[in-house]
Amino acid sequence: DSSVKSSFDKFFSEKDLKQILNKVSSKPGDILFIMSGDKKNTLEQMGSLRVELAKRFDLIDHNKMCPLWVTDFPLFEWDEDEKRFFSMHHPFTSPKPEFLNQLESDPGKVIANAYDLVLNGNEIGGGSIRIHSFDTQMKVFELLGMNKEEYTDQFGFLIEALKYGAPPHGGIAFG
């Protein structure tokens, strides 16, 4: 049977539904999960569904080691309740160089110079290249909503050091 049975098919024409099925190379008997809503929540829910289905259908080879480097994190996460950005990693993580020019114009699109090592779905290590520019660090503190007193009290030693220059540096921690 090649018919579509869903709670959302009433919102699409038959032509639209066929285009969706063709786009994903769907065949009769396939099941598609389509979700809409807030991107972060949608991705988390679909990820949980993927893992649950893999467990139920015994699709996970527990004898196989599957390491993965995750390298394209957003630098910031927007909190809708507080109407401000938070650091995804920490406030000293540098943006990837090609995203520096977007810090002011589109901070939500800036990608962090960070990395996690994941083994079979579990994070086993994480790190980043740190900010080594005074101006960039000040801009990040500003985007995080920190005032001068706040960042000076907490990180005055770092700010002072950055005024004199620092080499690019980074690290990774396991555990």
Residue ranges of model-derived segments:
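Structured aminoacyl-transfer and RNA-binding surfaces used for tRNA recognition/handling
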Residues: 1-174
